[in-house]
């Protein structure tokens, strides 16, 4: 048994057929082949990056309740929802800080906001337009 094991290991393996080296084309042929390949290739070899669509940005309409800060307004956003059990419409409000570059909005103005990247620790909205000036 020991001889059979050693005999199996000692048996020569069947060699794989050697790959034939590809023929090299003459210099004039290489230029012709390169020009032909260049005509067939339409872009880079790697996969080009496709632009991903940006997520939909939230837009909200609310009333300015404070304009005391520089280039910042505080807007009160109102949300109305129906109570799941009793059906009564409940009004909830939320105050958000919004960027007002030119400081044009005043207290009581009805404004349109759009979500944006974080501009400060608490500011994530920007003023799009003033829909109605306060009286």
UniProtKB/Swiss-Prot annotation:
Q: Does the keyword RNA-binding apply?
A: yes
What are the Low complexity biased-composition ranges?
8-42
Which GO CC terms are listed, alphabetically?
A: cytosolic small ribosomal subunit; plasma membrane
> Quick check: keyword Hydrolase in the entry?
no
NCBIfam families in the record: PRK05610.1, uS17_bact
Q: What does the UniProt record say this protein does?
A: One of the primary rRNA binding proteins, it binds specifically to the 5'-end of 16S ribosomal RNA.
Protein name stated in the entry: Small ribosomal subunit protein uS17
Give the organism the record lists.
Answer: Mycobacterium tuberculosis (strain ATCC 25618 / H37Rv)
